[in-house]
Amino acid sequence: MKCNDKMVVIMGATGSGKSSLSVDLALHFKAEIINSDKMQFYDGLKITTNQSTIEDRRGVPHHLLGELNPEAGEVTAAEFRVMAAEAISEITQRKKLPILAGGSNSYIHALLAKSYDPENYPFSDHKGSICSELKYDCCFIWIDVDQSVLFEYLSLRLDLMMKSGMFEEIAEFHRSKKAPKEPLGIWKAIGVQEFDDYLKMYKWDNDMDKWDPMRKEAYEKAVRAIKENTFQLTKDQITKINKLRNAGWDIKKVDATASFREAIRAAKEGEGVAEMQRKIWNKEVLEPCVKIVRSHLDQPINYYYYYFYLLKRFLSLN
């Protein structure tokens, strides 16, 4: 990689494997990862926001992941543009490859767009709201999963998250944090608002066997709402990625459906993380992505990005 001017951007719907792929690629290419999921910036709600565990990170440095105080307000896209740019600069100074991974596409646009107006929402219906000129020489990868397969997987994943303590985590968050007048930052995370009415109505008690039918229905209603809102989020994310593509962003799509079908089968049969699912992932997803990234890194320097990089370095030293 020459001149430290290139980076990889992993995109896709929630639950599509962006975090896993980013770590896989980081281990191949001596990279560090910058989180671009706006709900994962904050400390707390690690299960609810599905933050990568230390084990999942496999020794790869991560930036802007679970670092910020959730009571300090909301990180805006404009603030992320500055914070992530600083992380990119630090990573490239270490001669490492920056990998951006996450599903908050408006924040991704804010960071990468050469021209950015905080007052202009990029995904509005107004023509030309998305900036097609980029600050960095990006290799974009979109992990795509068939919608029906992804929805089934997300439903199973949420059931597992609930069994792993998501409800208890949300209840403790509500008890220990002062809620803002309007949802801000992590308070907007799917799960927090859906359980808000329930937690105002019932005192904390996780012994579900003692719950009356009305309480059980209130709980199940919240879980259904979480699933429905998660499904809608994935649709919105895909719509935004397609808008970026239509605006000229060269986003390469890699189909991960076969891997997710195997993950669903394994989950239903109680196998946990199946060896076969990993083999399919490596063949159908990781190997093509390694080729895409290697091809991008081997390309001649795009001197527009090189001179932009030098200008940034010059200004930072003066």
Swiss-Prot record:
The keyword ATP-binding applies. It is found in: Cytoplasm. One of its GO terms (biological process) is cytokinin biosynthetic process. Its EC number is 2.5.1.112. It holds the Pfam family IPPT. Disruption phenotype: No visible phenotype, due the redundancy with other IPTs. GO terms for molecular function: AMP dimethylallyltransferase activity; ATP binding; ATP/ADP dimethylallyltransferase activity; tRNA dimethylallyltransferase activity. InterPro entries: Dimethylallyltransferase (IPR039657), IPT (IPR018022), P-loop_NTPase (IPR027417). Its cofactor is Mg(2+). Expressed in immature seeds with highest expression in the chalazal endosperm. It catalyses: dimethylallyl diphosphate + ADP = N(6)-(dimethylallyl)adenosine 5'-diphosphate + diphosphate; dimethylallyl diphosphate + ATP = N(6)-(dimethylallyl)adenosine 5'-triphosphate + diphosphate. GO terms for cellular component: cytosol. The keyword Magnesium does not apply. Involved in cytokinin biosynthesis. Catalyzes the transfer of an isopentenyl group from dimethylallyl diphosphate (DMAPP) to ATP and ADP, but not to AMP. Has no DMAPP:tRNA isopentenyltransferase activity. Belongs to the IPP transferase family. HAMAP family: IPP_trans (MF_00185). This is Adenylate isopentenyltransferase 4. The gene is IPT4.
